[in-house]
Design a protein with these regions (language model features):
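Extended, structured, electrostatic nucleic-acid-contact surfaces
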Residues: 294-301
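Short, amphipathic C-terminal "tail helix"
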Residues: 438-470
Length: 470
């Protein structure tokens, strides 16, 4: 019997506010243990929380960016459970009236992964295990989160990977989080079950907790899918439980039985007022959102004639797309700008982290100036490429490296003379070309380009050389 994977995600994203959700403590990552906390975020008796309005704003932005409906009224609830990293013995979260309802994340295939809701909540502290002892660091306690809860629409590991990558990309684009999984500012709980292909009935699910690596998410899902299938086919039953993933052994193991909502005894938090969001506020926030990557990619393809693969590279990070947009202002061909960025500038930006920041020595205005010189016919493509390399090395503008004599192409007589010299000076290349080696012509064209300092038109030079060889 063939089985299919059924998965849904609960994705926790740390919001990029300066202070925590219910107090004025800093949210800065790191710091000595228990130095970024106060009586409110460690839950001392008599303290009262005060909701950070920026958290609500960021939650609304996330909802709009994922096509959700913003609730006019939402409320904070207490999720009750005892654990050392939860100082109050409850977490302030949302269950009954979350901030955003519905929405979806669209994959490259066109499939839409539906979202159940997005809610805001506080993070817990962190347990540190050392030499057989366990310590608690409350610096992270009270850091604001959104939790994005998907429907069980994911049917493959590839869909899971793309779903997480798309969420990460969108949240970075709108500027509400850096989504650095290695710093746990984005982490996922994966709910997974299996069922026979063609069946509509959901199987018993397990939950793999606190995954903060996309590669580990994929490996854990693959292992858990195979484990559940093997268990069912051997006559066993899948137990609803919470699992941890061990990347060293590539296995999952049980942490505890899986709780349902009623196990947490949710009730309305009496210390926090109802959140009211007006339609006017939603529209004002919507107006501040940047173009999102999917829409921007489509625009590059449809309006600027950028190949889809290149458009995806240009829109992967917001800083790159904004650089590209500025460099394209007033140019004849956006494709030329794209070629320079992808072909040359990217070679100086080695890591994905560097591409996300995209702090390069050539400003978009400087690249724009270079492309306009090329557009006007004052310089040729080879000279433009060579000039860009010098610009990247120095941070200087194009005109620092291009003299008046470099501008404008070769006249016909000068081109003919250089082509004759190329043929006369490169007998072996001429002979190779005559013997059917097409690539040999490149050496002859290279001679012309070098001796013209890039002013010659390469295509015209190649045609003239072929004419001379006969």
């Amino acid at each position: 019997m063939k089985y299919e994977l059924v998965a849904g995600f609960e994705t926790h994203i740390e919001l990029a506010t300066k202070t925590k959700i219910f107090c004025g403590c800093t949210t800065q990552f790191g710091g000595e243990p228990n130095t970024h906390c106060c009586p409110v975020c460690i839950g001392l008796p008599g303290t009262l929380p005060k909701l950070n309005r920026q958290v609500v704003r960021y939650g609304i932005m996330a909802g709009l960016a994922t096509h959700g409906e913003i609730a006019e009224i939402s409320k904070m609830d207490r999720k009750n459970y005892c654990y050392p990293d939860l100082s109050k013995a409850y977490q302030i979260s949302q269950l009954y009236a979350p901030l955003t309802i519905g929405g979806y994340v669209e994959l490259s295939s066109g499939k839409k992964i539906r979202l159940h809701h997005i809610h805001i909540e506080e993070d817990a502290g962190k347990l540190i295990h050392q030499h057989g002892d366990t310590y608690v660091d409350y610096n992270r306690g009270g850091v604001p989160l959104i939790e994005i809860v998907s429907e069980p629409d994911i049917r493959s590991i590839d869909e899971a990977r793309e779903y997480v990558e798309k969420l990460q990309q969108v949240m970075r684009y709108i500027g509400i989080s850096d989504c650095k999984m290695q710093e746990v500012s984005m982490r996922c709980d994966v709910n997974i079950s299996v069922r026979p292909v063609g069946s509509e009935k959901l199987g018993t699910r397990t939950e793999i907790k606190n995954m903060n690596s996309i590669n580990n998410i994929c490996k854990a899902m693959e292992y858990e899918f195979e484990r559940q299938v093997d268990l069912i086919e051997s006559g066993g039953q899948v137990v609803q439980e919470t699992l941890r993933y061990d990347d060293a052994t590539n296995t999952t193991s049980s942490m505890r039985s899986k709780e349902d909502a009623h196990d947490y005894r949710y009730f309305r938090d009496p210390d926090l007022v109802t959140i009211h969001v007006t339609r006017k506020e939603v529209e004002e926030i919507k107006a501040t959102l940047p173009d999102l990557p999917t829409e921007k990619c489509k625009r590059y393809v449809d309006e600027l004639s950028i190949p889809e693969k290149d458009a995806q590279l240009l829109t992967k990070y917001r800083n790159i797309s904004e650089y590209f947009d500025k460099a394209c202002e007033g140019v004849k061909s956006a494709k030329t700008v794209s070629n320079f960025i992808i072909g040359q500038i990217f070679s100086r930006v080695e890591t994905e982290a560097d591409k996300e920041v995209f702090d390069v020595s050539v400003s978009p205005e400087q690249l724009n100036e270079l492309v306009k010189l090329l557009d006007s016919g004052k310089i040729r493509n080879n000279l433009a490429k060579a000039t860009l390399e010098k610009m990247l090395d120095s941070g200087k503008g194009a005109l620092e490296f291009i003299s008046e004599s470099d501008m404008g192409g070769l006249d016909e007589n000068a081109m003919l003379e250089l082509c004759k010299q190329a043929v006369e000076s490169n007998a072996k290349a001429v002979e190779d070309y005559k013997n059917g080696k097409e690539k040999a012509i490149k050496a002859l064209v290279g001679f012309v380009m070098k001796n013209s300092r890039g002013k010659a038109d390469a295509a015209a030079a190649e045609a003239k050389i072929k004419e001379l060889i006969g």
